[in-house]
Amino acid sequence: MNLANLQLFAHKKGGGSTSNGRDSQAKRLGAKAADGQTVSGGSILYRQRGTHIYPGVNVGRGGDDTLFAKVEGVVRFERKGRDKKQVSVYPVAK
């Protein structure tokens, strides 16, 4: 009588590991107000890292380079020299 020594193994290999599979959250950078749009004082106009766009008339720059309106008015994106851009807010006469 032959007794077979039957041994069962896993039929799939282990899952292994990878160093991928992560990504950072989107930071929602960019324009928050359009050219010609009316904004109130304190409104965020442009979120950025560094100064892609410079602050113009009645526009302030926050600690993280965010541009915001200092007064209520109309937004204007303008050229500053040959290769720079700026955003300004001009008050509307009532």
UniProtKB/Swiss-Prot annotation:
InterPro entries reported for this sequence: Ribosomal_bL27, Ribosomal_bL27_CS
PROSITE patterns linked: RIBOSOMAL_L27
CC annotations in GO: cytosolic large ribosomal subunit
GO function term, MF aspect, one: structural constituent of ribosome
Renumbered residue ranges of the record's region Disordered: 11-34
Entry comment on modification after translation: The N-terminus is cleaved by ribosomal processing cysteine protease Prp.
Keyword tags: Ribonucleoprotein, Ribosomal protein
Residue ranges annotated as propeptide in the record: 1-9
Gene3D superfamilies associated with the record: 2.40.50.100
Coiled-coil positions: none
One example of a Gene Ontology biological process annotation: translation
Segments passing through the bilayer: none
NCBIfam families on file: L27
Family: Belongs to the bacterial ribosomal protein bL27 family.
The protein's name: Large ribosomal subunit protein bL27
Species of origin: Streptococcus pyogenes serotype M3 (strain ATCC BAA-595 / MGAS315)
Lineage, top ranks: Bacteria, Bacillati, Bacillota, Bacilli, Lactobacillales
Encoding gene (name): rpmA
